[in-house]
Amino acid sequence: MRSTRSIALATLPAAAAIALWNGYRRVSKELGSHVAASPLIPGKVRSIPTSWGRLSYRIVPGTDPGPPLVLVHGWGRSADSVWWPLIANTQRTVVAIDLPGHGRSLLDQRFTFDLAADAVLAAVADSGVIRPVLVGHSMGGPVALTALRRIAQAGESDFAGFVAIATSSYWVRPRHQIMVAAAPYAMAQGSPILMRAQRAETRRAPDQASRIAWEYAVRPPRRILEEAAAELRRFDARRWDDLSLPPAVWVITLDDGIIDPADQVASAQNLGIPTVDLPNDHPVVIQAPAALARIIEEASSVWSLNRPIRIRRRMLRPNGADQNP
């Protein structure tokens, strides 16, 4: 009797492993039935050779004479996969940047926020936009703050304003540390956790299955996720004494499961930035793009009063510098 029970207990780990593997295969097969397809996004993709690889960004000319928008995406995403809903809901000129190692931007060295900030400023200079509004979502907030700090250190003022969305000026709390340390493994391509998240999202919106598959397919490799997560774990702008901000607004996502709304509010208060609340979760750009566009446009219209907003005449480009979307 004891022998039979011992054998049964010994087989439990193997049975559990087989069950997990079969579950993984079922989820993989279900997700594999959806063909990844991006939404139609206007504008052109431009690329710049750099010392660290290649910088790519999308520029969308707008009809609204207000300040252009420079959009900086968050961790594990790309310009197109985050910002396409906002682009569809604004008539402003938009520059949406793929950070190094993300989207179409290539990176042959370690990812850092300083390098990402340089990429943002390089895209602004190459695009020809004058006094744009800098918009950062999630990790894009720290990258944008780093870019603004670099400008302040140089004694320059190139932005009409700054909009922080669902982000924090510090990521050093224990909860942040644990979450960010685990994220590169939990959210890398092929991760069972990521696959189950995609399946749940697809089942909630089956008519958007192809678009959802595309958003998950364009995530960066694990190396970039790990290096970006390491930068986040070190980031704390609360003690920066050389940061000079343009007019700004901080969008608080009240139902955020990634960045505690209390940390968002504390970040804004620490930097002296007024806040606007939205009753959304972390992916607010997907959930409420029209409301977000309205907040950005109303704030930046006030900031731009009596300010010349225009686009410089671009220098002639070699053939092939602009790409189709």
Predicted regions and their residues:
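Active-site loop/oxyanion-hole signature of alpha/beta-hydrolase fold enzymes
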Residues: 95-133
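Flexible "cap/lid" loop of the alpha/beta hydrolase fold
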Residues: 146-149, 153-189
